[in-house]
Amino acid sequence: MLLLAFGNITDFRTNEMFVQHVLAMDTTNFGQAAGQGLDADIMWRAVRSPVLQTATYCLIIAWEALSGAVLLVSVWQWLTGRTSQARATSTVGLLMVILQFFGGFIVVGGEWFQMWRSTQWTGTEVAFRCSVLALFTLIFVQFGRILPDGQRETGQ
């Protein structure tokens, strides 16, 4: 997540354009030219303000940086043997990742802003992969709570 935030900061314009097109809903027309063949029944959802689009992108980057920092702390906790703390911190960080990719990109971007209808500016497949990876990691982290002999972890 920290690398993702770093990439979005150092190559700000590329992904800002992505966010702008998704929020503006100007390519939700199944591959037609931008602005053509748009569904008038849903275009009221579009956010056309460049200020709001950029603010949204900055919030995404901030969320990525924060979730990355939480996960980095959890890695340090795992490495220093603070198992219970690491599990709790990992859970928070992974839930933040799931909230961003599933809640933010698939639900809000994909469904509310109809990102799935765009042939050029859709990120639903990538968001799905990231959501599933974070979910499986979360499950793996939580399964470690019960030791093989059935005893509960005592941890620090």
Annotate each PLM feature.
Residues 8, 12, 41-44, 54:
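Generic structural signal for short, flexible, solvent-exposed coil/loop and linker residues
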Residues 1-22:
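N-terminal signal-anchor transmembrane alpha helix
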Residues 1-7, 54-60, 66-156:
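Extended, low-polarity transmembrane helix blocks
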Residues 20-51:
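Extracytosolic (periplasmic/ER-lumenal) interhelical loops and adjacent juxtamembrane/interface segments
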